[in-house]
Amino acid sequence: MHFSPALKSGKLLKRYKRFLADIQLEDGTEITLHCPNTGSMRNCLFPGETVWFSTSNNPKRKYAHTWELMTTPTGGLIGIHSGNANALVEEALNKGVITELVGYDSLSREVKYGDENSRIDILLEAAQKPACYIEVKSCTLLEDGQGYFPDAVSLRGQKHLRELMHMASLGHRAVLLFVVQHTDIHSVAPAAHIDPEYANLLKKAVLSGVEVLAYRCEISASEIHLAHACPVRV
């Protein structure tokens, strides 16, 4: 995924009201960005460090600028736009990057499934193969060298694990795919210290036949894409 037009940068001042962030440009001007991340963004906020943002030419938008990347104090980069995760996975699937998920003929997005009124992020289908239901989660929380998900209690995430277990019980292929949008994260684990119920459900899901994958992103100010598989420590 290329950032076009090119991203611009500023220094983070603060994030507030969940969906807003104030930054300061090089000339001292302060502007407000839309923050496209509904999570807590725990350990992803570094006031004074460089942020990268995109700009929309849609005159109907209240906030023309969208926060895309955060630079860490060690020089790493974090993909702030959690909504990019599904598009990154679709792009990677089309290129055959996710080797565990090759060999399917069709890809659909946001298809209704399960028994809790859910929509699957990605559905892969092929003749003479079980359908493959993929839930995509963006992982950005880094603590003591370990990547974790979720970064806050996630009832929605718990529901999705139950849905995946249900699909696996019906004979379908069920996959939980973590998209690691943090260049300093090299493995992913459930955040039992934040959401113990999610961690317990994930263990049950694996025992029920749900596959758990994680892929790291390569991130720069010009592009972001899925690149390499990394371990998941369930």
From Swiss-Prot:
Pfam families linked to this entry: SfsA, SfsA_N
Domain of life: Bacteria
InterPro entries, per database record: SfsA, SfsA_C, SfsA_N
Parts of the chain that traverse the membrane: none
Coiled-coil residue windows: none
Molecular functions (GO terms): DNA binding
PANTHER family: SUGAR FERMENTATION STIMULATION PROTEIN A (PTHR30545:SF2)
Family: Belongs to the SfsA family.
Protein name: Sugar fermentation stimulation protein homolog
